[in-house]
C-alpha cells in the first residue's frame, strides 16, 4: 500500500509562480476571478499528474496553518524572526490567492481526499505525524511530496518488512531532473532482483511502482543520509528558514557561524562520530570547550543543553518535540481516519483535473480549456491527455 502525503502549500506556491512566469497565460497579480480560476486548475493539474505517476492507495494533503508554534521560539533569539528573510510580493493579491487555496482544500476534502490542517502546525509537522502513524505504527509505505528539503530527514526503510518512506521533489533541478530521495537500504532493495514463485507470492506492487517512476528520464534517484541532514541543520542552521546555527557571533560587523567544514573540525576534535555523540557532549556541557577552541574565544553565556533543545525544536521533525496540543489533535481527529476509507483511491488508475474540479466554480458544465491556459498545462498534456479515463471515485 502506498500513502501519498502532499505538501499542499508547497505545490500551490509553485503553481502560483508558474502561472505568472508563463506569459501566455496572461496572469498578473490574481486580481480577477478568471486568474484565480487558472490558478485552481493549475494546482489541481499538478496534483493529478503526481497521482497518475504513483497510483497511490490513499491521498493526504498536509497544510500550513497561520502563526506556527516555532515563531515563539524566536522570542529568545535577538534580532531574528522565524522565516523572517522571506519577503512577500505586495503586488500580488494574496487574499485572493489564499482564498482560492482554501476553496481547493474544501473541494478536495468533499471529493474524498484527506486534508489535514491543525492550528499552529506546519505541513512539516503533519508529514512527520503521518509518517509515524502510517510507516512506524502500521508498516505501510509512504511517499512524501515536497520540494522542502527538511522533509528528507523523514526518509526511512524497514529491512525486516521492506516498507519505505521516501520523498519526491516535483520541482526539476537545473538539469531538468526531479528527485526521488531515499535511503541506501531502500536503494539496494529497489535494485535487488525480484525472486518470486509461480504464484508471485513475493511480488511487490509498491516496489514495481517506485521502479517505474525512477525509470522515467525526467526523474532521478538520490541516496541521502537522513541523520546527516538533521545534524547539519542542528549545528549549522538553515538560511532558507532563517534558522540560526548552534553557535554564532559577530566579529567586525560580520556574522561568524558554523559551516559544514567547521562542524567537521569540531566533531573530529571532540571525537564525535554521529548526532547522538554530539547530543551527549551538549548534555554533559563539554561541547562548549571544543567550540571555544574552534572559534578561539571564551563561551560563558551558553547552556549547551538548552541550545541543543532549541535547535532540535526548530529543525527536527520528531513528534516528541511538537506541542502536545498538536499531537493530541492529530491522534484524536486524523489518526482514526486511517481505519476508514477516507482518502482511499485504491483501484483508480488515473485522475483528471476536470474530474476533481467537476461541478465547482472552476470547472462548470461544458467546460473547455481556454487558449491562454494551454501554455501552463502543456507539459502535462503530452503525457496525460490521452491516458486519463473516467474516474469512478467522483
How would you label these PLM feature ranges?
Residues 7, 148, 275-279:
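A short amphipathic alpha-helix within small helical-bundle interaction modules
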Residues 49-63, 78-92, 113-114, 132, ...:
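Non-catalytic nucleic-acid-binding/docking modules located in mid-to-C-terminal regions
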